């Protein structure tokens, strides 16, 4: 998992968005960003604030975890460090591409403060390698775009400033 990468439970039934509504009995799958800690808190804050509208994960991570690839219309619940729901998002686009081919439009949607593709890649490579995934130009990356739906909390959501985020915490 990398900055903005996600983990999706394979045994939670998918919820589909249809004509702007989600079925009343739809069960969203959990969406975890990075590992618990400052990075997750920072990324969750970006989602809730409406800034982060995309995430990236390694295809090899999906395969190792037995996870399904998100599909357009999937409803997912962003969770905090304790696995508690923070907000719902709906998947709007999914692409599986080589790491070398990640487009700038994705980096802009992920909106994690990167000012170039090289900076985005360096940050993601550092994270993925810190959790024991080797990456190169041909590594397949799952790019997922989403829209923010319901926010589950009325009170403040812990925010972490960008400078407090370290790939190893």
What are these regions (language model features)?
Residues 1-88, 94-169:
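Mixed-charge, low-complexity intrinsically disordered regions
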């Amino acid at each position: 998992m990398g900055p903005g990468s996600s983990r999706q439970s394979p045994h939670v039934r998918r919820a589909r968005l249809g004509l702007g509504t989600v079925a009343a009995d739809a069960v969203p799958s959990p969406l975890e960003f990075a590992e618990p800690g400052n990075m997750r808190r920072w990324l969750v804050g970006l989602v809730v604030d409406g800034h982060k509208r995309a995430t990236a994960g390694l295809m090899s991570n999906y395969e190792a975890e037995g996870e399904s690839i998100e599909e357009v219309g999937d409803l997912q619940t962003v969770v905090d460090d304790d696995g508690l729901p923070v907000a719902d998002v709906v998947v709007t686009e999914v692409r599986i591409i080589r790491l070398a081919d990640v487009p700038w439009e994705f980096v802009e949607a992920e909106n994690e403060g990167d000012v170039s593709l090289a900076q985005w890649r360096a940050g993601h490579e550092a994270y993925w390698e810190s959790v024991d995934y080797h990456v190169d130009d041909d590594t397949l990356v799952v790019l997922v775009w989403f829209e923010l739906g319901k926010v589950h909390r009325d009170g403040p959501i812990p925010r972490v400033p960008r400078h407090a985020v370290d790939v190893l915490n």
